[in-house]
Each structure stands twice: as structure tokens, then as C-alpha cells.
């Protein structure tokens, strides 16, 4: 068993991921390898995991579990524990952009929700779907313009919210249009918000209620778009958004931008959330 996005990616896509993260992750991987041979240097391994943004608590648990195993060398034991920690959050169905009929993207400002929405639409379209994009970030007029341009590039229809208006109204219009026109999935871009702003987080809960009321039979997937450069703040984001909107999975962005990505380990281990997709570039095909 592997990560949700890894299980369904092709060999070429896996190679693209490895190539994209090599510049930023190579030093961490080298440190892990040095600490594993010939005998495990457990304190050095713990430090390497912390430097990868896995967090102190997660790093300590991983090392303690690896030390407790009896079968295999240090590399085998550490790999086993890491994969288990990641897979505990990936036990849901494999990432398939055609499967959920409604995808709600949430996250803080600048995480990459708008571009991720367009990438998901392109992915769905190439897989035979008929996606509909929804510009429900009504706080930032530029976000509506950006999604419109991306939708035109991918030749995907888009429903736009009114600047300053109620995003739930845009979602209502989109779900109605999708039902009439037979479009799926409906991919909703929302405004960025801090997980500490309770009023804005309550708005996300309202959006989910609207979706469940208008499309009671739809399979809804709430995806947290998480900037891999956020470090351990990403774990706090995941907790906050999960409480407000019931997050089903994570899209890890900017892995090609100097990120170590260890926060994914903390999110998977502590919240049991699968990493559905990773973004390793700006192109529509850089969602894997």
C-alpha cells in the first residue's frame, strides 16, 4: 500500500515527483542515508526528520517505533514505520478526480487553491469527466478573474460568484447548472482564510451544508490545499479546517519550491488524512 496519489500515478509521474523534489529534499535524504549506514544513528535520524518539517513529536514517535522493530536493518525498519504512518491516512479510496461529484477546495491565502482547481479540472477532463469550475472566492475579485482565465485555457465551463457576494449563492447556482447540464465533478474554489478566524471558518461549514442540501446523493470531497513550505504551521491549518469543514484529504502544493514536505507525515499520522494529490509545478499536468 502507498500514498493515495502514488498508488494511482504512472511510473513517469512518479519520476516527475522524484525529480521535482530532488533539489529541496536531496539534503534530507542524504542525511537519512548517512544516519542509517552502517548502523542506525537514531538521534541523527530524529534530527533529520525534524529538519524535514515532520515536527518534533512525529519524529520522536517514528524513531521510537522504528527502534522497537526487530526485523530488518535500520533502513527497512524506518521505511516500514514511515510508510505505515503515511498509509494510516491513505486507507480511503485511491485518488481519482472522476470519483467525487463535488470537490470543495479550502485553505489559507496563497496556498494555491485557484490553480489547483484548474489542474483538477484538466485532470478530470483528460480522464473523461465533464468538470464545472466554481469561482466562489468572492472576497478577491482577482481570484474570479484568474479562475476565468484558467478555465478558458482548459476549455472548462465556470460559474462565477458576484464580487463581495455570498459564496454559498455561487455554489447554489453551480450545483443547479451541473444537474441540468450533466456536469461532474463540480470543483469549487473558495476564499483563503486563516484557521483562527471563526466567522470565516463558519462560512465554510455553511457551504458544505448547502452542498449537502442541494446534492444529497453527491459524493463530496473537501480537500485542504496545503503549501508544503508552511512547515509545522500546516498541521495547525489541517486541524482548524478539519474541525470547520470536515477535511477528507490534502493537496500538497509547491513541493518544487524548496519545500521538505515533512508536514505531510504529521498530517497523515495525527489526523489520518490522505495526501490525495501533490503539485510540483505551474503547468496543468504538474498535479500528480
Features from the language model and the residues they span:
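P-loop/Walker A NTP-binding module and the surrounding RecA-like catalytic core of P-loop NTPases
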Residues: 83, 87-288
Amino acid at each position: 500500500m502507498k500514498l493515495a496519489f502514488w498508488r494511482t500515478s504512472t511510473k513517469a509521474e512518479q519520476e516527475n515527483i522524484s525529480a521535482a523534489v530532488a533539489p529541496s529534499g536531496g539534503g534530507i535524504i542524504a542525511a537519512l542515508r548517512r544516519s542509517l549506514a552502517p548502523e542506525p544513528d537514531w538521534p541523527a535520524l530524529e534530527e533529520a526528520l525534524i529538519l524535514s518539517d515532520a515536527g518534533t513529536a512525529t519524529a520522536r514517535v517514528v524513531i521510537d517505533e522504528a527502534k522497537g522493530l526487530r526485523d530488518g536493518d535500520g533502513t527497512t525498519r524506518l521505511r516500514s514505520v514511515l510508510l505505515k504512518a503515511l498509509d494510516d491516512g491513505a486507507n480511503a479510496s485511491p485518488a481519482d478526480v472522476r470519483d467525487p461529484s463535488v470537490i470543495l477546495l479550502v485553505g489559507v491565502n496563497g496556498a494555491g487553491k485557484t490553480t489547483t482547481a484548474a489542474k483538477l479540472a484538466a485532470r478530470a477532463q483528460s480522464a473523461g469527466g465533464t468538470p464545472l469550475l466554481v469561482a466562489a472566492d468572492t472576497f478577491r475579485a482577482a481570484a474570479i478573474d484568474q479562475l476565468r482565465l484558467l478555465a478558458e485555457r482548459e476549455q472548462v465551463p465556470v460559474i462565477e460568484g458576484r464580487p463581495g457576494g455570498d459564496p454559498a449563492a455561487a455554489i447554489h447556482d453551480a450545483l443547479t447548472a451541473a444537474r441540468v447540464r450533466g456536469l461532474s465533478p463540480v470543483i469549487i474554489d473558495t476564499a483563503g482564510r486563516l484557521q483562527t478566524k471563526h466567522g470565516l471558518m463558519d462560512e465554510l461549514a455553511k457551504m458544505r451544508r448547502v452542498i449537502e442540501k442541494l446534492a444529497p446523493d453527491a459524493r463530496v470531497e473537501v480537500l485542504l490545499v496545503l503549501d508544503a513550505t508552511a512547515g509545522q504551521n500546516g498541521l495547525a491549518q489541517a486541524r482548524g479546517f478539519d474541525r470547520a469543514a470536515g477535511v477528507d484529504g490534502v493537496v500538497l502544493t509547491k513541493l518544487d519550491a524548496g519545500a521538505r514536505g515533512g508536514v505531510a507525515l504529521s498530517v497523515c499520522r495525527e489526523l489520518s488524512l490522505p495526501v490525495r494529490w501533490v503539485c510540483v509545478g505551474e503547468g496543468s499536468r504538474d498535479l500528480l
